[in-house]
Amino acid sequence: MAKIYYDEDASLDILKDKVIAILGYGSQGHAHALNLRDSGLNVIIGLHEGSRSREKAKADGFEVYTPREAAKRADIIMFLIPDTVQPEVYKNEVEPELNSSKTLAFAHGFNIHFRQIVPPKDVDVFMVAPKGPGHLVRWMYTEGKGVPALVAIHQDASGTCKDKALAYAKGIGATRAGVIETTFKEETETDLFGEQMVLCGGVTALIKAGFETLVNAGYQPEVAYFECLHELKLIVDLIYEHGISGMRYSISDTAKYGDVTRGERIYKVVKPVMEKTLEEIQKGEFAREWILENKAGRPVYYALLERDREHLVEKVGEELRKMMPWLGKKELK
């Protein structure tokens, strides 16, 4: 069973005289920074000149520096910028300011695990990865609660890296809920797998396949949209709150019987594909592909996104959502 840490397992004292630099001020960045400061810790923000987030961070009362200056001033440097830009920022801004007294921190293990960032051996490296979006991390903290997180140690040069990691987790409120010990390898590989085969790639492929099957069989696209996409939220919310068995408790017997008998057909086809995809992740094949795709300017990435934007399910959904005044109309672009 996993090792789980709570408030009583961590002490903020080890960070009391430290300066923590948060690189980035997006969803996670602002939540970490505000929570750490409210926990009594000294936080500064690192953002490039011209970043649209600089004024927001200043308005929230933080001292804002360039990433290099923040790295110079800080004892702990937390990377909360996109994975794809971290290696360049590390090489150009952070690495020149590193010494054995500093600690590198991450919220995702991709660049450490796949060696896009290779820190000096005398530097502590840890990960604290909340299992929820930044706005939830912040909201739960202000309510006196917390969002669960993962914690991992990559390098413990000082002998106190784990204490610092748990203190950081406590500072953002995660130990109120529970912090699960893992490794950079496990967090990275399971995170990529979940995104590709279940949460993002799996769900969107299942929606499109179901929608296309009904439309190709002569059913109205609008009806197919409701059955294969819109109603998914109802089921996911039940699973999220009560688990699979709890969801089944809340649906009709007809739906339940179809679930346990026909769902097995999907399982048998998909599981071997999932196993192959996991193997690609474990061997580093996906990482190499994605790194090269970025270096080439993302031609495949943009082409596939554009293809899916033109899918009929998107066109139908755009019109049907106009019939639903209860949906938020927030502009995502």
Swiss-Prot record:
An annotated Gene Ontology molecular function: magnesium ion binding
Gene Ontology terms: cellular component: cytosol
InterPro entries per the UniProt record, alphabetical: 6-PGluconate_DH-like_C_sf, KARI, KARI_C, KARI_N, KARI_prok, NAD(P)-bd_dom_sf
List of residues binding substrate: 252
Entry keywords, A to Z: Amino-acid biosynthesis, Branched-chain amino acid biosynthesis, Magnesium, Metal-binding, NADP, Oxidoreductase
Cofactors (names): Mg(2+)
Active site: 108
Keyword Transmembrane helix among UniProt keywords: no
Highest taxon of source: Bacteria
Domain annotation KARI N-terminal Rossmann: ranges: 2-182
BP terms from Gene Ontology: isoleucine biosynthetic process; L-valine biosynthetic process
Enzyme Commission (EC) number: 1.1.1.86
Keyword flag Mitochondrion: no
Annotated residues for binding of Mg(2+) 1: 191, 195
Residues the entry annotates as binding NADP(+): 25-28, 51, 53, 83-86, 134
SUPFAM superfamilies linked to this entry: 6-phosphogluconate dehydrogenase C-terminal domain-like, NAD(P)-binding Rossmann-fold domains
Reactions catalysed according to its record: (2R)-2,3-dihydroxy-3-methylbutanoate + NADP(+) = (2S)-2-acetolactate + NADPH + H(+); (2R,3R)-2,3-dihydroxy-3-methylpentanoate + NADP(+) = (S)-2-ethyl-2-hydroxy-3-oxobutanoate + NADPH + H(+)
Cofactor: binding details: Binds 2 magnesium ions per subunit.
Domain KARI C-terminal knotted: 183-327
Pathway(s) of this molecule: Amino-acid biosynthesis; L-isoleucine biosynthesis; L-isoleucine from 2-oxobutanoate: step 2/4; Amino-acid biosynthesis; L-valine biosynthesis; L-valine from pyruvate: step 2/4
Sequence positions that bind Mg(2+) 2: 191, 227, 231
EC supergroup of this enzyme: oxidoreductase
One Pfam family recorded for the sequence: KARI_C
Chain's role: Involved in the biosynthesis of branched-chain amino acids (BCAA). Catalyzes an alkyl-migration followed by a ketol-acid reduction of (S)-2-acetolactate (S2AL) to yield (R)-2,3-dihydroxy-isovalerate. In the isomerase reaction, S2AL is rearranged via a Mg-dependent methyl migration to produce 3-hydroxy-3-methyl-2-ketobutyrate (HMKB). In the reductase reaction, this 2-ketoacid undergoes a metal-dependent reduction by NADPH to yield (R)-2,3-dihydroxy-isovalerate.
Family: Belongs to the ketol-acid reductoisomerase family.
Official protein name in the record: Ketol-acid reductoisomerase (NADP(+))
Gene field: ilvC
